[in-house]
A protein has these predicted regions:
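Accessible peptide chain termini
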Residues: 1-3, 23, 45, 74
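N-terminal polybasic/positive-inside topogenic patches
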Residues: 3-18, 23, 28-39
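Extended, subdomain-level signal for the structured scaffold at the beginning of enzyme domains
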Residues: 30, 34, 39-142, 155-158, ...
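Short, hydrophobic beta-strand segments that form beta-sheet elements in well-ordered domains
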Residues: 75-77, 146-150, 165-170
Length: 229
């Protein structure tokens, strides 16, 4: 069974258990296959937040490549579970904000990564979300990974998460990355925070997320599978 099929099977099991009343924590441990590095059998989750007007490539490329690498990924709709992107593509998200919040309330150790795509007005809507803010606070507190691309690093900047960090964003948003050390690059990783410039950097951004979660070998396997340069 290939890695993509295994991940698909795990997601199906996860969702089936969520629909029962056995509790999120139990479902998370039964339905997911991504084990913690400490080998204690704990399971982790990646949350990708989508708000009205999000940039589709920047959101779905990370979802696709992370799942190819075997990561457990859930899309979270801000304001609704059906979210329409900047170019008219509507996505039926896996979770509502309330469901996502409940999931980390019951299993805070499951928060492995939070990802914010850019796009307009998607980025502005992400910045207004209390749920997104809560997830970023929780991720920063526990040292979980945070990924943001295009205009979305401005959401991190507004929360002071980029002070003293190397970062990059869509041209023109630099002043919103308060305290950051702006670099001229497509993708920049500084510790647990990964930023990318724009839609054209979506594949490299996603591969960097894979590398952070699963290691460079996994990222290279995905790169080879999609024939990325």
């Amino acid at each position: 069974m290939n890695i993509g099929l295994r991940a698909s099977v795990r997601r199906k099991r996860f969702d089936e258990h969520i629909k029962t009343n056995i509790g999120f924590t139990a479902a998370l441990r039964i339905g997911s296959g991504a084990k913690a590095a400490d080998g204690n059998g704990e399971y982790f989750m990646v949350y990708v937040f989508l708000a009205e007007g999000f940039e589709e490539i920047e959101a779905l490329t990370p979802v696709d490549l992370l799942r190819r690498a075997g990561a457990e990924v859930r899309t979270v709709g801000v304001g609704s579970k059906n979210i329409t992107g900047a170019h008219g593509i509507t996505v039926a998200c896996d979770m509502s904000e309330d469901e996502a919040s409940a999931s980390i309330k019951e299993a805070p150790e499951a928060l492995e990564m939070t990802v914010l795509p850019g796009g307009m007005p998607g980025t502005l809507n992400l910045g207004k979300s209390e749920t997104v803010s809560h997830f970023l606070d929780a991720a920063a507190k526990r040292g979980a990974y945070i990924g943001a691309i295009c205009a979305a690093p401005s959401v991190l900047g507004a929360k002071g998460l980029l002070r003293g960090r190397r970062a990059v964003c869509y041209p023109g948003f630099e002043e919103k990355l308060t305290g950051a050390k702006i670099e001229n690059a497509g993708v920049v990783r500084d510790g647990n925070i990964i930023c990318a410039r724009a839609a054209g950097s979506a594949v490299e951004f996603a591969l960097c997320l894979v590398s952070a979660l699963k290691g460079e070998r996994a990222a290279e396997e995905v790169r080879h599978a999609i024939i990325a340069q």
